[in-house]
Amino acid sequence: MLKGKDLLSIHELSRDEVEEILSLAQELKEKQKAGIPHRLLEGKSLGMIFEKSSTRTRVSFEVGMYQLGGQALFLSSRDLQLGRGEPIKDTARVLSRYLDGIMIRTYGHERIEELAEWADVPVINALSDLLHPCQALTDLLTIREYKGKNLTGLKMAYVGDGNNMTHSLMYAAAKVGMNFAAATPEGYEPNAEVVANAKADAAATGATVTITHNPMEAVVGADVIVTDTWASMGQEAEHDARTAVFRPYQVNWELVAESGDARCLVMHCLPAYRGEEIAEDVFEEFADVIFDEAENRLHVQKAIMALTMGN
């Protein structure tokens, strides 16, 4: 279903395509653990454009391509003419002559959309300021591992900044029939257009999307609580001001207890700033879940690459 397609936003995927990614990711994870070769991208090359640095993204994509039998090329803005003013459309057309796929991690989402418009090979959004689809799909896989494959009717609560993770988690939950609630401070709400799109997606699967300023209200009945850093990359100058505003949104035991579910999971996409968005003792209690989540980025991204770039 996904062969030759871009993956820019979960909103653009069908429910079947989301399920296809998750199922293949689980299969590839099991094969990797069992030492069974799965060189689905033998002879293929992925270009990795990094305008925004990352530990997990680079390592997981690079290792993933190696395990699939292909190769990954790291391209920082210093390595590309993009950094010297070459139009994105020219870079896209040139790289399409050399590569079988392009992954990009950048700031403005419009840069990814323009790259995809002009590229003749699949483009994968590895993060923009608006969306983080690979991580949100990873979170779905992790929840499936702990809660079972049928996610319909479960509730995901997000507490913190209305950022790219909020947006992509909202889309992901809606696509698989999970109810979603986000709690953010006033002035830090998620993008209104994304919320409207997610509500439309949720209506199609019988789910709900709720936005509130009350973190205790958001987590009631939650099967999983997700949080993220209060100041994303590029917002370092706002750290102190944001910390003051977000302090009531820390994921601590008092908040987790409000879920009313002793089996409620806590997840974090990392890096985590313990004592800020998540209490140290809560992080350590759910460390196995959080690091399973980190590992699953590898398997989900392998599935995305295999489905979009493979034969």
Show where each model-derived region lies:
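Positively charged, low-complexity intrinsically disordered leader regions
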Residues: 1-59, 63
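Phosphate/diphosphate ligand-binding glycine-rich loop within oxidoreductases
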Residues: 35, 39-144, 274
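Glycine-rich phosphate/diphosphate-binding loop of Rossmann-like nucleotide-binding domains
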Residues: 51-63, 146-227
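Short, acidic/turn-prone active-site loops that include or flank metal/cofactor-
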Residues: 78-79, 127-131, 185-188, 294-297
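A short, gly/pro- and small-residue-rich
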Residues: 113-128, 237-258, 285-287
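Rossmann-like adenosine-cofactor binding region
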Residues: 200-280
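Adenosine-phosphate binding glycine-rich loop
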Residues: 263-311
